[in-house]
């Protein structure tokens, strides 16, 4: 298909271990049949996330690109997004029919946000196992992203987290912004996330 305005660019952020790469893989699987999809992963010194996606065979190799950011990972998605913008330009040249590019940030803290120049839509992932108080910390990634994913809710009983209270705190932190309570490895929440991307992203 491909839009005259270029592909929808979806930024995926969140702390290390929250489930960003799992989300990227699930979205590529879920949307790769109906849409022309590509993925850019950001890692500090390796291309480990890109290699994981290649091994999982979620997309053909020519649709996955790993960039090594060096230093602080949020710089490559915010202050100086040139390395990611160059990867997008390369994809658009090679795959002119692209509908969606998922841009996965390197693991960072709750303050990381995407430059509007880089991402049209932002998704932020947090980990239930990181503790009951995460939504109350209200970092910009958590409060300002277009969609928040509270991942690994299946682990709540094992880490002493009350899911009802976690959701109440999430709702309070988000205001009117959307969120999904999910368990991405089990596919829980993925259909809702795909629907959100289609509706809000105009696919």
From Swiss-Prot:
Gene3D superfamilies: P-loop containing nucleotide triphosphate hydrolases. Belongs to the SIMIBI class G3E GTPase family. UreG subfamily. This is Urease accessory protein UreG. Keywords: Chaperone, Cytoplasm, GTP-binding, Nickel insertion, Nucleotide-binding. InterPro entries: CobW/HypB/UreG_nucleotide-bd (IPR003495), P-loop_NTPase (IPR027417), UreG (IPR004400). HAMAP family: UreG. It is found in: Cytoplasm. Its main location: cytoplasm. Pfam families: cobW. GTP binds at residues 14-21. The lineage of its organism: Bacteria, Pseudomonadati, Pseudomonadota, Alphaproteobacteria, Rhodobacterales. Facilitates the functional incorporation of the urease nickel metallocenter. This process requires GTP hydrolysis, probably effectuated by UreG. One of its GO terms (molecular function) is GTP binding. The gene is ureG.
């Amino acid at each position: 298909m491909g839009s005259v305005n270029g592909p929808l660019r979806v930024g995926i952020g969140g702390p290390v271990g929250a489930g960003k790469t799992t989300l990227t893989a699930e979205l590529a699987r879920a949307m790769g049949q109906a849409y022309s999809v590509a993925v850019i992963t950001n890692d500090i010194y390796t291309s480990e996330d890109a290699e994981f996606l290649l091994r999982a065979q979620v997309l053909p190799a020519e649709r996955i690109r790993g960039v090594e950011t060096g230093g602080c990972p949020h710089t490559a998605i915010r202050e100086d997004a040139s390395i990611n913008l160059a990867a997008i330009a390369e994809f658009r040249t090679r795959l002119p029919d692209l509908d969606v590019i998922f841009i996965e940030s390197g693991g960072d803290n709750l303050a990381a946000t995407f430059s509007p120049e880089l991402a049209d839509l932002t998704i932020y992932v947090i980990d239930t196992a990181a503790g009951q108080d995460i939504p109350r910390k209200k970092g910009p990634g958590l409060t300002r992203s277009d969609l928040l994913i509270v991942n690994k809710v299946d682990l709540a009983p094992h880490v002493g987290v009350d899911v009802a209270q976690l959701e109440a705190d999430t709702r309070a932190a988000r205001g009117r912004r959307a969120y999904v309570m999910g368990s991405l490895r089990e596919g829980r929440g993925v259909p809702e996330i795909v629907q959100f991307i289609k509706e809000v992203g105009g696919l």
